[in-house]
């Protein structure tokens, strides 16, 4: 295999894939990125058996082939190479040579056939949503996602799509976050859709979502996976196969106390109070805080 890339274009494709590459795994193939030639360029694939990404990059293909190159080393090499053309060449002994100008590196590659089979990147249900809208919803609830909780559904965010209304819920047994908003949706499915996505997968998805108002992403729901189809890349993740908790019963139907407070001063006060209350419990930060309400005044103590 011999291919020639523009360095910055290849590096821009490789960096987002590092979050879906398995680190220190007994299966060497999933510690790398599969580079496979195709018409007009190359397809890069990364998959850690839970989440993955496929990206198409334009390049000059001199000799066809498909090989797995260590993701960490590949990104480190590309960072230090000079701008311009980068040549990747693999010989019959599976030695990959990465060169640019007078600089060159040699690594060991694995045959592309060792790479795990990717799930089918198609779904029965499909809808399109603005990237900024989806980003807003995820950001509003990510803080309450559990980490390594024995109840698997709490380690993710529960999404419900009903018409043009999208609801996102997270709960770590201490906190519950809910974000509901009307979105500009285009859907090929008339009924309600719901699914639970792992928090780790959403962390990587946030890195891909654009903040522009005009950008959208097509989402396809398969039996076990959900696929996010961007313009030149596809991100997919396994869904959490579990029923979500009945979160609505934790939200009071009626309230005796209503308080309105200015946001910025309240946030600054919470930040100061949290300096002496934070403690780590099972990998999560817990911050007990006492709120005292009097007429015209809210006192925070810790």
Model-derived regions, located:
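Structural preference for solvent-exposed beta-strand-turn elements
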Residues: 1-302
